Design a protein with these regions (language model features):
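Charged catalytic and DNA/RNA-contacting regions of genome-maintenance
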Residues: 1-366, 379-382, 386-395, 399-485
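Conserved interaction-surface patches within small, structured recognition/assembly domains
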Residues: 369-373
Length: 486
């Protein structure tokens, strides 16, 4: 468009850097979509499609949503399989010399959600990765909202089938894989509901990643579905899966010298899958994701593999036909989202290690035998927020002041929980008690710095307690008493 305004050119440049996404472009109090993105957004969100620059005879399709409710619109698009690039104004309009600087600060994909609108409190949301070399297949599973990170590897003629069963058991929202593996992946998951591609390519000027345009959303030729939940297929450029680069990325993330302590020695395909998973998460979040602090390697024989047909027929997590309740519905008496997600994972991926099973039974038996201790423990846990996801939002820079207060109130329960479990006989309860850190310094810092009832957003002010920061107190005084001082 030769006569494009500076703002439109800025949009086009950012869009060119992030093809394969719908670009939410911040303009004042709205996020705007232009050109083909606007047509798609208006159709999928059922909002009005209008046009910009009609008077010039070359109208630009556009639609928009208010920034304060954008999360709900983004959630609708991501649930449909779209990927959304969020572009923010990164300088104040009053300070901008000409055009306000804007940058893409995050890409929301089906497998990397952190916003509450895209998360179920009692279910994990996994990004999965799969790769293969010969008869060895590796896979990794990452819940970026909590930092849970797992990897596995299988070898032999039936390795692919075993890994596919693992992937089905995790029910990821998104599966990434090397482009070279596209035919095998699409054949293996041809019964699913929707697919998509978001390949990343190396920028010729740097080591940053660029998204290669293969469309905003998938075609519907292939079908992807597990227990009623569709997931998206995402092909990534093959260079992202180099073993040495993936290992180096994981080592840097975990702050270690080698991956031997994680059971990943000579597990090259597991390392490749995990490294690609981590890189994809970091690139979409535009953050280091420091809450992803370790990884658990598991052997296929460590757990019972239940394929999707078995899970459905046994009604483990979803009832069939006229049944009103699944097995999970019947037994789930957990009082925290963290406990609910753990119970669900135990049902879908049962351990077959005798020691682990007996330890769980011992802990349950002890609490079952003492209803006083059990009821007291449940009352304490009811005061605990979803600390896993709270810390995830903190590390990804999306936490609110109220999240900090919720974290402090949750940590306030830890000393009482430890006291309650201190004299337990169960080996598992003892291990949990010994591992629990009361984080007294963190609790004290939040209590001293943050108001008990802060506003929802930092920008609203009134978050930091008076007296915590001398500099802030002086600035508040200047703001409050400016007229008198003048």
């Amino acid at each position: 468009m030769s006569n494009a305004t500076p703002m439109v050119r800025q949009y086009q440049e950012l869009k060119a850097q992030h093809p394969g996404t719908l670009l939410f472009f911040r303009l004042g109090d709205f996020y705007e979509l232009f050109f083909d993105d606007a047509v798609t957004g208006a159709r999928e969100l059922q909002i009005t499609l209008t046009a910009r620059h009609k008077e010039r005879g070359d109208p630009i399709p556009m639609c928009g949503v208010p920034h304060h409710s954008a999360a709900n619109y983004i959630a609708k698009l991501v649930r449909k399989g779209y990927r959304v690039a969020i572009c923010e104004q990164t300088e104040s309009p009053s300070k901008a010399k000409k055009l306000v600087r804007r940058e893409v600060v995050r890409i929301v994909t089906p497998g990397t959600p952190i916003d509450p609108q895209l998360l179920e409190p009692r279910e994990s949301v996994y990004l999965a990765a799969v790769c293969a070399q010969g008869e060895t297949v590796g896979a990794a599973f990452l819940d970026i909202s909590t930092g849970e990170f797992r990897a596995t590897q299988s070898s032999g003629r039936d390795a692919w089938e075993r890994i596919v069963a693992d992937i089905e058991s995790y029910a990821p929202r998104e599966l990434i894989f090397p482009q070279a593996l596209s035919a095998l992946v699409r054949a293996g998951f041809r019964n699913e509901q929707k697919t998509g591609t978001l390949p990343l390519a190396r920028d010729g000027m740097s080591d940053n990643l660029q998204i290669v345009d293969e469309g905003n959303m998938a075609t519907t030729d292939d079908k992807l579905k597990f227990v009623g939940l569709p997931f998206t297929l995402t092909a990534l450029d093959d260079w992202l899966w180099q073993t040495e680069d993936c290992a180096a990325l994981l080592i840097k993330q975990f702050g270690v010298r080698s991956l031997d302590g994680y059971g990943l020695t000579n597990k090259h395909e597991a390392v490749r899958a995990a490294g690609a998973c981590l890189r994809y998460a970091q690139e979409t979040q535009r953050a280091a994701a420091a809450h992803i602090g370790d990884i658990v390697y598991f052997e296929p024989q460590d757990q019972l593999i239940l394929d999707q047909i078995t899970v459905r027929n046994l009604e483990l997590v979803e009832a069939m036909g006229g049944a009103s309740r699944s097995l999970l519905d019947v037994i789930d008496e957990t009082v925290t989202g963290m406990g609910a997600r753990l119970l669900r994972s135990w049902l879908l991926r049962p351990s077959i290690r005798r020691g682990e099973i007996e330890a769980r039974h011992g802990a349950v038996a002890e609490l079952y035998a003492s209803h006083i201790k059990r009821d007291h423990l449940r009352s304490l846990l009811k005061e605990v927020a979803d600390v896993e996801r709270l810390t995830g939002r903190l590390n990804l820079g999306s936490a609110t002041p109220r999240d900090l207060v919720a974290l402090r109130r949750s940590l306030d329960q830890v000393p009482s929980i430890r006291d309650l479990l201190a004299n337990g006989e169960s080996s598992l309860l003892q291990v949990l008690n010994d591992a629990a850190d009361e984080l007294a310094d963190v609790r004290a810092l939040i209590a001293n710095a943050i108001e008990d009832d802060p506003p929802a957003k930092v920008i609203d002010g009134g978050v930091i307690r008076a007296g915590h920061s001398t500099e802030l107190d002086e600035l508040r005084s200047l703001s409050r008493d400016a007229k008198q001082m003048i």
